[in-house]
Amino acid sequence: MLLASTTSASQLFVEMPEFYAWFRFRCDSYVRFWKAIHAAAHAARPGIDVRFNDCWIYPEMLGFDLKGMSPYFDSIRAADYVEETGDPELMVAKRGFYHAVRRAVGLDKHFVTALSQRVRATPALIKETILMSAQCGADGTTIASYDTATPALLRAVREGFAEAGIEVAAPARAG
């Protein structure tokens, strides 16, 4: 009704006020849910990082109002993994996704992205994801699916950070 049509969401809300009422209820319910989760988690363990893992390019279509929810999570991770499809045309939507997340949560919210190195990903798409993360205001990048990564994709991660001018800190040693 919406994604496959040229009709805008605004027009559907005008035509079907009950749809808007349901949608508003759903968004408000998720905000209340995250408020309760955040309060309970911080009461049980002060200093905990309550993170929202956003893997939907259009989270609002599911009723996730990131702007309304963001006071009730401490960080957000954007993980759509389109680079693992091997299709460079999907990267345009990925950039829009990252910008939308940063816009919704503001500049002060800790925001990390994710990249996947599954076999259809290419070194070029891995590098593009890393650069895009930096350009879109991410505070860091997480690496997923490294267990299935080829040596070329693992090298692309290292090279991507270097080419983007991002210094990767050595992991802290336990002890």
List where the protein language model places each region.
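Substrate-binding cleft of secreted/luminal carbohydrate-active enzymes
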Residues: A79-L90, L107-A174
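Alpha-helical scaffolding within the catalytic cores
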Residues: C55-G68, P88-R103, A124-T129
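Surface-exposed amphipathic alpha-helices with a cationic face
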Residues: W34-P46, H99-K109, R158-F161
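Polysaccharide-binding and catalytic clefts of secreted carbohydrate-active enzymes
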Residues: M1-P88
